[in-house]
Amino acid sequence: MDFYYLPGSAPCRAVQMTAAAVGVELNLKLTDLMKGEHMKPEFLKLNPQHCIPTLVDNGFALWESRAIQIYLAEKYGKDDKLYPKDPQKRAVVNQRLYFDMGTLYQRFADYHYPQIFAKQPANPENEKKMKDAVGFLNTFLEGQEYAAGNDLTIADLSLAATIATYEVAGFDFAPYPNVAAWFARCKANAPGYALNQAGADEFKAKFLS
């Protein structure tokens, strides 16, 4: 199973943890966006949107990290704990995945990426929105072990990849005790977490040092 990725990318790390959780070995294909490797004709045939992560499973190409996570959990999961079949439980997992994509990860990008890639000054309004996003997650976690209940799901793996990026960027989790406790549980219990940490550290070394 080919996996086109960059280790520093939080979405790529979320897929790597999901693959570890379902026991699937990925054939890693480093894809350097800075060198334009995602624009090569052979890659565009696989993914005309030319983004990573991209997974190719026996000729079936799929991109968008959360779609890949769902695919891996449904096809290769040994049970439904990672992605529950119960409609309401699954709906909560989906909501958390969409929250990560549209709010938590996006607000990190909105605040940090203009500084990293365009050398713009920090935007206090975007910083507040980023903190608000972590506050939402802190509320979601009230009274439960994980993001969608008391079992670790693919939502936690996606969120943990994002929060690991917040961590290496120096975000202070002290005002968000539920997030801090949950993140410690993810570090201890998420399959493949070492890959996530290594990738987050690489992101820091490349873009935040």
Curated annotation (Swiss-Prot):
CDD domains given in the database record: GST_C_Delta_Epsilon, GST_N_Delta_Epsilon
Activity regulation, per record: Inhibited by S-hexylglutathione.
Pfam families, sorted: GST_C, GST_N
Catalytically driven reaction(s): RX + glutathione = an S-substituted glutathione + a halide anion + H(+); 1,1,1-trichloro-2,2-bis(4-chlorophenyl)ethane = 1,1-dichloro-2,2-bis(4-chlorophenyl)ethylene + chloride + H(+)
Molecular function GO labels: DDT-dehydrochlorinase activity; glutathione transferase activity
Keywords, comma-separated and alphabetical: Lyase, Transferase
EC identifiers of the protein: 2.5.1.18, 4.5.1.1
Domain of life: Eukaryota
Xref: InterPro entries: Glutathione-S-Trfase_C-like (IPR010987), Glutathione-S-Trfase_C_sf (IPR036282), Glutathione_S-Trfase (IPR040079), Glutathione_S-Trfase_N (IPR004045), GST_C (IPR004046), Thioredoxin-like_sf (IPR036249)
Span of domain GST N-terminal: 1-80
GO biological processes: glutathione metabolic process
Amino acids binding glutathione: S9, H50, C51, I52, E64, S65, R66
Residues annotated as domain GST C-terminal: 86-207
Subunit structure: Homodimer.
Function text: Conjugation of reduced glutathione to a wide number of exogenous and endogenous hydrophobic electrophiles. Has DDT dehydrochlorinase activity.
Record PANTHER family: GLUTATHIONE S TRANSFERASE D10, ISOFORM A-RELATED
Family statement: Belongs to the GST superfamily. Theta family.
Protein name per Swiss-Prot or TrEMBL: Glutathione S-transferase 1, isoform D
Biological source species: Anopheles gambiae
